[in-house]
Amino acid sequence: MSKRDYYEVLGVARGASDEELKKAYRRCAMKHHPDRNPGDAAAEAAFKECKEAYEVLSDGNKRRAYDAHGHAAFEHGMGGGGGGPGSPDMGDIFGDIFGNIFGGGAAGPRAARRGADVGYVLELDLEEAVAGIERRIEIPTLIECVSCHGSGSEDGKVQTCGTCHGRGQVRIQRGIFAMQQSCPHCDGRGTLIQNPCKTCHGAGRVEENKVLSIKVPAGVDTGDRIRLAGEGEAGPAGTPPGDLYVEVRVREHAIFQRDGDDLHCEVPIRISQAALGDTVRVATLGGEAEIRIPAETQTGKLFRLRGKGVRSVRSRSEGDLYCRVVVETPVNLTADQRELLQQFEATFTGEDARKHSPKSATFIDGVKGFWDRMTS
């Protein structure tokens, strides 16, 4: 019996794109999959025909050979007995197309799990976070066993698992669907170790403290994460390692509070400075700066110093420094100072008090009005 044209099998034109081929194969395979047609020999044969056609047409070299010579291109050396050219494994093609629907993705040792990711909290002072720093850290982790180079075998020899036949996964029937899961016999490796390594006892990994140097970019803030690819735990049986995620945590500062790329601080000034005005020096992360306090400044007034905040780790623009003035009440007064203040206070009488302390007068008037309403 002659074979059907592969394009006809998938129902596509000869100029079909790779994406069109994949969609056509998906439709064909879904329709004829044995799990949907249990005991149907015709459906099983059609399913194999779909796989065979897709294996050829999805491979550029095979497709060119087929377009030039038809089925004759595979009559010598590519047969492979009843399964068509190359006899594709369902895990190679069908699993790649359908993911978890029928096979859980690409099967076998190729899909073996990677090493676990590792987290580390790095505490920094505000100055370190703003300027950037290189810091050495030590983390407990699993590294590849140097004795067996991660194989877990003392002599380097491994045996193919008889349960999963080296694929690392086994099929589990769930109604009309067949699911795949990690082989419980070989733990998903696809191989078994007859002579375990004496150092790692067959695990291929050993516990050890790893010392790393981390370059922290300038401008990081609490919650930012730095990813170091491949610096997590070593993968089992030589699979790729996980990643290391360093989470930044910035300690509280004695002077500054951070809000994004802006900084805030309080600047205490004396009553005389607030009343008469003055120029005061304030601390910034880059040194000192001056702010001019105008006469009659009240507590809470904000002064903005542009560009004196934090340089953004993302945009590289600079934030600002906001200085909030706090008028400080004098303490530990001498007798002379107390007398001077008493003389000063004596000048606040009548309308002069309302003129020189308008907020106090407004507050007193408000309290008086409240009690008048309560007692009326």
From Swiss-Prot:
Its cofactor is Zn(2+). A zinc finger (CR-type) spans 132-209. It holds the Pfam family DnaJ. It is found in: Cytoplasm. GO terms for cellular component: cytoplasm. Its main location: cytoplasm. SMART domains: DnaJ. Gene3D superfamilies: DnaJ domain, Heat shock protein DnaJ, cysteine-rich domain, Urease metallochaperone UreE, N-terminal domain. Residues 5-70 form the J domain. HAMAP family: DnaJ (MF_01152). Participates actively in the response to hyperosmotic and heat shock by preventing the aggregation of stress-denatured proteins and by disaggregating proteins, also in an autonomous, DnaK-independent fashion. Unfolded proteins bind initially to DnaJ; upon interaction with the DnaJ-bound protein, DnaK hydrolyzes its bound ATP, resulting in the formation of a stable complex. GrpE releases ADP from DnaK; ATP binding to DnaK triggers the release of the substrate protein, thus completing the reaction cycle. Belongs to the DnaJ family. This is Chaperone protein DnaJ. The gene is dnaJ.
